[in-house]
A protein has these predicted regions:
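Glycoside hydrolase catalytic-domain context in secreted enzymes
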Residues: 29-301, 305
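Bacterial Sec-dependent N-terminal signal peptides
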Residues: 1-32
């Protein structure tokens, strides 16, 4: 029954995402999860078929969510990234996040995010896949330039400003990579073994600030394992910490190709598999629904609802 509840939750979140994004198409103001938006999502959810729900929790065409054309919900267009739009044609290259963090200027981070948000709107991008806030632990990590250093306080302040700037333009920001993605080498197999105190003092602060202060719309999980469990299927990390302790209401998506198993990801709390539903496959989910082993219809609805209102 627990796995059932997770899928229901993910469907609702995805629906909330879609409805909220539809509103943002006509306004640059940051939208929030209002009662009206929730009601719209619930109405759509009640009319969706099982196939529509199962398909909606996986992306399509590399950088898009699925449209729900009969409900007027467009596909959501995503783009990397932290330092400018890295997809959908030539674009402006912004200074890297490390340079931005070196200014210690949160207002500048907000202006940076606002400019990036305007760039997104000009290109029809609904969701930008940034900021990235991995804490520096491995100096040889090839993506350190994308991040904001090793100081959890500085990273929290700069990421919060960045997110407020982006979302102030009616574009969804995505904080990544949750969590402890300290090296890109062999990242699909590395386990970052970290005690709870270190997580709370070093790794969590920037993500917690993004959720509680900036109300970030999306969180992207990482490729690695945390203490022997993949972050895309880690109930303590995704449900207990992110959802319950911090009160995150947005979408939790996988990094591209970082979903490793279907049912553990569903039970763990993952909402959206990107770039496609290759592990959380509709046919496999249908099988478990039919057999009644660990899934039922409730489990499919919440990710869809959240995507609609976001």
């Amino acid at each position: 029954m627990k796995a059932t509840t997770s899928l229901a939750t993910s469907c609702r979140r995805l629906l909330l995402w879609g409805v909220l994004t539809l509103q943002c198409l006509f306004s640059t103001a940051q939208k929030r999860f209002t009662a009206d938006v929730e009601q719209q999502a619930e109405k759509i959810l009640s009319q969706m078929t099982l196939d529509e729900k199962l398909s909606y929790i996986g992306g399509i065409n590399w950088m898009y969510t699925r449209p729900l054309e009969r409900f007027g919900i467009p596909r959501l267009k995503m783009s990397d990234g932290p330092q400018g739009l890295g997809t959908h044609g030539p674009s402006t290259a912004y200074p890297c996040a490390l340079m931005l963090a070196a200014t210690w200027n949160e207002q500048l981070a907000t202006e940076y995010g606002s400019a990036l948000g305007k760039d997104c709107r000009a290109r029809g991008v609904h969701v930008v896949l940034g900021p990235a806030v991995n804490i520096y632990r491995a100096p040889m990590c090839g993506r350190n330039f994308e991040y904001m250093g090793e100081d959890p306080y500085l990273t929290s302040r700069m990421a919060t400003g960045y997110i407020k700037g982006v979302q102030g333009q009616g574009v969804m920001a995505t904080i990544k990579h949750f969590i402890a993605n300290n090296s890109d080498y062999d990242r699909d197999h590395i386990s970052s073994d970290i005690d709870e105190r270190t997580l709370n003092e070093i790794y969590f602060p920037s993500f917690r600030a993004a959720v509680q202060e900036a109300e970030v719309g999306a969180v992207m999980s990482s490729y690695n394992l945390l203490n022997g469990i993949y972050t895309t299927e880690h109930p303590w990390l995704l449900k207990d910490v992110l959802r319950q302790q911090w009160g995150f209401k947005g979408i939790l998506m996988s990094d591209w190709g970082s979903t490793h198993h279907c049912i553990p990801a569903v039970k763990g709390g993952l909402d959206l598999e990107m770039p496609a539903g290759s592990k959380m496959q509709p046919e496999e989910l249908k099988y478990y629904l039919r057999t009644g082993d660990i899934l039922s219809l409730i489990h499919i609805s919440e990710p869809t609802r959240l995507a609609l209102i976001s």
